[in-house]
Amino acid sequence: MRWRREALSHLVKAASWLSSLDLPVRLIAFPEGALQGFNDEVLDLDHATFAREGAIDIPGEETEFLGTIAKEYGAFVIAQAKARHPDLKDRFFNVGFIINPRGKVILQHYKVSPLFPVEHSVCPHDVYDWWVEKYGRNLQAFWPVVDTEIGRLGIMMANEGSYPENARALALNGAEVVYRASYPHPATGNEMFEIQSRARALDNNLYVVAPNMGTYYLFPEETTPIDTFGGRSFIINYKGQIVGRQDYGAGSTYVGGVVDIEALRDHRARAQWDNWMKDLRTELYQLLYEKPIYPKNLYLKRAPMKHKEYREKVIKRQIRLMHDRGIWVKPAR
């Protein structure tokens, strides 16, 4: 982890120095995977083993390190880690977190939509009954937002942004700036990552900060890093327009851009048409979700499945459900 910390420190130094030639840097966002990579997913590792040996604690040594960066630059830091929960033995979640300029963790978001079928993380919906009993059944329990001097911040990691509901939940909970990272190639090269991120920003009149991963080493002994993400990091404004873009992915780089919270707030308060959320016909939309689709409490009494088992027991069943309900039409062959 030491060399990774050095690499992150050097990257922040370069990025902050050059970006501050325009305006002061107040927010530093590391992509999902920056601390640990994705080896638990790529190598299909046993969940309990990784929970004990690879996952971290929040707060902990890693967040303390990121806290030193926050204090040094007087900035908020957003990052991600596979992390344990103190009340669930041999389990880990995918957690996005925010650190304030004083080095304190002020928000933790537990990813609610892992990347199926490869991601092994438990999510709140997988232990839904336990989660609701502990944290309640409200927006803050699943899509937390923190109010800061640079705006209201929230987190929507990677595959969470594939579902419009997650961005809308954050927006309805007050979010103004949402972190959305990372997304793998070919979903970057075919523009899926960009289309989704811009749509989430436009639909909800919020900023989306979407740093993607650079190259990384799958094993310690490897000499050739792999670019499996394809670059295309963005900062997107509340009208869905890109205000910062970095297409390069095969290495270590950064993207910078201006986040104008006052302009966002003015647009939300002044616009007559394209400040969409004021017009939500919620009584109608509730009909969409009366019938459950994805099963809750999937991992309340067992560890997450490995890739093959998940495909067989969950993905095939979910596709069959869509056909049986007449929502999807089966292909001719």
Where are these regions (language model features)?
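Eukaryotic scaffold repeat domains enriched in small/polar residues
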Residues: 4-7, 76, 142-145, 330-333
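Active-site catalytic loop in hydrolytic enzyme cores
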Residues: 85-176, 185-199, 229
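CN hydrolase (nitrilase-like) catalytic-core segments centered on the catalytic cysteine
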Residues: 55-78, 152, 158-256, 332
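Short, acidic Gly/Pro/Ser/Thr-rich loop/turn segments
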Residues: 36, 106, 162-164, 216, ...
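Short, flexible/disordered intra-domain loops and linkers
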Residues: 1-2, 41-47, 221-226
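C-terminal beta-strand edge segments of enzyme domains
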Residues: 212-333
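Cys-nucleophile CN-hydrolase/nitrilase-fold catalytic domain and related Cys-dependent amidase chemistry
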Residues: 5, 9-102, 106-110, 117, ...
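Acidic/histidine-rich helix-loop elements
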Residues: 1-5, 55, 120-128
